[in-house]
């Protein structure tokens, strides 16, 4: 009886989390991923995005696992996370002054990949928007966990740095293996790596968050990464300060799909 009660409580928690992820997903980010610049999307395109978010929400099975580790910079300049060592000048700057770090893995689950594959086979225009929406949704999920951690550490008088993922700046993608091994991500979160270091499920993230005793002045402190903090100026997805507030623009309108069509049953 107690087991059944706990099962129902978990189902309710998951439904609440899924609603939080959908509700906090940054719609501007979705249009930015789709190549929009400078102009507001049309109503039918906004409706298509909302439709994709709603449908994706029904396939979410979010999982998150992370651990805190002591952190130091060794004499040779390498970063010692206790469970592994790494080299990255941009990450070293991000973690300056930190003596602990929080490493984590997060995923939207295998159901999202299944939905994306299905639409790739039957309706590519919608699949493209689905991909962008799912990418924004995993960021939204990480932001939710980021805020939860910030509150927890804040009660101890500690502050978080912007999260930093392998492949970001000069932090090599090779360190995905170190994250996966140290955190036992296959067991703890259902995340595996391919030989080419891609994560499965595809809408998954690994990252390190610095923990310090002083507030961080870097952009993105409140909830994750910021384009302003990244040195990759030529990134096609880089957020630009252009146009008026609340506007996004487009350079590839057709890629978002056309029309407010009836959703296929799949």
Feature names for model-found ranges:
Residues 62-71, 149-164:
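Flexible, glycine/charged-enriched surface loops at secondary-structure junctions
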Residues 94, 107, 129-132, 136-137, ...:
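Residue-level preference for alpha-helix termini and adjacent loops
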């Amino acid at each position: 009886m107690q087991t059944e009660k706990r099962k129902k409580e978990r189902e309710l928690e998951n439904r609440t989390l899924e609603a939080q992820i959908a509700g906090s997903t940054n719609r501007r980010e979705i249009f930015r991923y789709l190549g929009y610049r400078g102009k507001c999307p049309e109503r039918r395109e906004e409706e298509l995005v909302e439709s994709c978010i709603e449908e994706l929400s029904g396939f979410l099975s979010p999982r998150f696992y992370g651990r805190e580790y002591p952190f130091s910079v060794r004499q040779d300049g390498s970063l010692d996370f206790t469970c592994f060592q790494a080299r990255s000048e941009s990450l070293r700057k991000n973690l300056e002054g930190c003596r602990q770090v929080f490493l984590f893995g997060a995923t939207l689950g295998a159901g999202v990949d299944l939905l994306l594959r299905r639409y790739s086979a039957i309706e590519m225009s919608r699949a493209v928007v689905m991909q962008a929406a799912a990418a924004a949704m995993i960021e939204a999920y990480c932001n939710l966990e980021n805020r939860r951690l910030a509150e927890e550490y804040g009660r101890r008088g500690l502050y978080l740095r912007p999260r930093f993922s392998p492949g970001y700046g000069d932090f090599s993608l090779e360190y995905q293996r170190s994250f996966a091994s140290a955190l036992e991500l296959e067991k703890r979160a259902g995340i595996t790596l391919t030989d080419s270091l891609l994560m499965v499920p595809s809408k998954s993230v690994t990252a390190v968050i610095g923990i310090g005793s002083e507030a961080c002045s870097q952009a993105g402190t409140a909830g994750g990464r910021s384009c302003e903090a990244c040195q990759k100026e030529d990134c096609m997805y880089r957020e630009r300060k252009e146009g008026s507030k609340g506007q996004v623009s487009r350079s590839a309108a057709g890629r978002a799909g056309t029309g407010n069509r009836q959703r296929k049953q799949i």
